[in-house]
Swiss-Prot record:
UniProt entry tagged with the keyword Hydrolase: yes
Biological classification of the source: Bacteria, Pseudomonadati, Pseudomonadota, Gammaproteobacteria, Enterobacterales
Pfam families: CN_hydrolase
Subunit structure: Homodimer.
Active site, renumbered: 45 (proton acceptor), 127 (proton donor), 161 (nucleophile)
Gene: bxn
UniProt-recorded name of the protein: Nitrilase, bromoxynil-specific
Keyword Zinc carried by entry: no
SUPFAM superfamilies: Carbon-nitrogen hydrolase
Catalysed reactions listed for this entry: a nitrile + 2 H2O = a carboxylate + NH4(+)
Stretches assigned to the CN hydrolase domain: 5-274
Similarity section: Belongs to the carbon-nitrogen hydrolase superfamily. Nitrilase family.
Amino acid sequence: MDTTFKAAAVQAEPVWMDAAATADKTVTLVAKAAAAGAQLVAFPELWIPGYPGFMLTHNQTETLPFIIKYRKQAIAADGPEIEKIRCAAQEHNIALSFGYSERAGRTLYMSQMLIDADGITKIRRRKLKPTRFERELFGEGDGSDLQVAQTSVGRVGALNCAENLQSLNKFALAAEGEQIHISAWPFTLGSPVLVGDSIGAINQVYAAETGTFVLMSTQVVGPTGIAAFEIEDRYNPNQYLGGGYARIYGPDMQLKSKSLSPTEEGIVYAEIDLSMLEAAKYSLDPTGHYSRPDVFSVSINRQRQPAVSEVIDSNGDEDPRAACEPDEGDREVVISTAIGVLPRYCGHS
C-alpha cells in the first residue's frame, strides 16, 4: 500500500433537519473531494441531519417542537441515505467518514460511519457519552464503539467532539494502531471550549499524543441555520453565523492544510505521508516503547451493552405473549449486515 495520499476535511452547512437533502449534499461533496484527488474525506459530527443547535438557543420547553421535527429526520444505519453515500464512495473510489443522528428502536444516537473506497462499511460507532444537553436527546454508546479499521489509505479511527478530550479514548485508539484520526465536530460556537482556536489546540495535542494525522471537520451556520433554529427575533443572529474551523494536522502538530474563514463552506486538503509516523513513533509511542504497563494499565470492556438481554425458554414452547411483542421499529435491532457488506443499490445483491 502506498504511504502517501491526499486527505480532505469538510467545512459546510448541512440542510438543517432534512436527512435526504443532506445525503444528496454529501454525495456532491464526495464527488468534489474525489475530483480534487482526495482518497479520504471527513464530514462533521451529526452531519445528517445537522447538529441540533436549537438546544443552545432555546429553553427546555421551547425545544420540544424542534425535537419532534429532529427525531423524524434521524436515520437508520442501513437506511437509503446511508446506501446513497456508500454508492458514492464506491463510484468515486474514495473512503469517507460522516456523522449522523441514528435511530435504533425509539432511541437516537450520535453515530459515525467509516466507509472504504470500495463501498464497504468499516466502522459503525456511537458517541460513548453525549455532552451536556445532548444527553436529553441522545443515548450512549459502549466499549464496542472504540474502533480502528484498516482501510485503503491506512488504519483509521474516529471520535465525536469532546470525545477527543478523553485521555482513555485516545489511548484506546492509539493502542489499536491508529494512523489517521477523524475528529468530527459541530460548529465552533456556544461555549468557550468550542472556540475554534481551542478545538484546534485539542486536535494538535491529539496528533502529538497518538502520533497520528488528524482530520478535523466542522459544520457552518449560515442564514438558513438561523432560520431553522428560529432565533432571528430572539438574539443578534450575527453571533451565531459561521463556526467553521476545518483543519488537518500532522503528528508534529503542524497545520498541513489551508484554512477557510469561519463563514465559508468548502473542503480543505492535505498531502499525507504515513512515513512521518515512523519518526513520530520513534520519538514517542505512548502505547508501545514509551509506555509503562507495569505502572499503568487500561482495561476496556468492548462487549455490546443492549438495554434488554433475553433468555429463551429452554423447553421450546411457544410463548402466548409473542403476539403482543412490539413492532421491529419499537426495539433496537442489531444490524448484522451493517459492517463489511457492499452497497445494496450499486449493482450488488
